[in-house]
């Protein structure tokens, strides 16, 4: 989630610099999110169009953009797995999730009711999920001490509890079922339903 926000902020900065003439690019460059989704093409500014002020700025300030090589052409599909969210009412909601995305991000992108109040900074337990099958729980990396500290505060803690912001989609987790607890511990007013960030 935070990677996505940084990527959006970076692309906004690059667009603004290009629009104001502080950034010159040679050839068309693509900016990509970490999941390989196309964001935008930057305009081509010929070398002759530089003013002395632009030349000085570019000489004294370095800018760099990059993209993943697997998605530069935009024709390769990102590998995805299926994660099955089990909501508070017991309804199973299967979701396709790109490899490398957190469970919290996947929930927010698919309008699943998983809070994430601290925006994945390991400062709350509102993205608490319960891995329903021990087989899948054993495939996860061990939780860090920081995650365990936050899990101690989680509502309805179980032996297979994890924080959704710390569970990252990997091929071996294809088909994992994650239960969303019926409540969270947060300092919000009763009945308040926060919007995903």
Curated annotation (Swiss-Prot):
Disulfide bonds: none annotated. The keyword Transferase does not apply. This is Adrenodoxin-like protein 1, mitochondrial. Binds 1 [2Fe-2S] cluster. The keyword Metal-binding applies. Residues 1-35 form a transit peptide. Associates in vitro with the adrenodoxin reductase MFDR to form an efficient low potential electron transfer chain that is able to reduce cytochrome C. Functions as accessory mitochondrial protein involved with BIO2 in the plant biotin synthase reaction. Belongs to the adrenodoxin/putidaredoxin family. Its cofactor is [2Fe-2S] cluster. One of its GO terms (biological process) is biotin biosynthetic process. Residues 79-184 form the 2Fe-2S ferredoxin-type domain. Keywords: 2Fe-2S, Biotin biosynthesis, Electron transport, Iron, Iron-sulfur, Metal-binding, Mitochondrion, Transit peptide, Transport. The gene is MFDX1. It is found in: Mitochondrion matrix. InterPro entries: 2Fe-2S_ferredoxin-like_sf (IPR036010), 2Fe-2S_ferredoxin-type (IPR001041), Adrenodoxin-like (IPR001055), Adrenodoxin_Fe-S_BS (IPR018298), Beta-grasp_dom_sf (IPR012675). One of its GO terms (molecular function) is 2 iron, 2 sulfur cluster binding. GO terms for cellular component: cytosol; mitochondrial matrix; mitochondrion. PANTHER family: ADRENODOXIN-LIKE PROTEIN 1, MITOCHONDRIAL-RELATED, FERREDOXIN/ADRENODOXIN. [2Fe-2S] cluster binds at residues 118, 124, 127, 165.
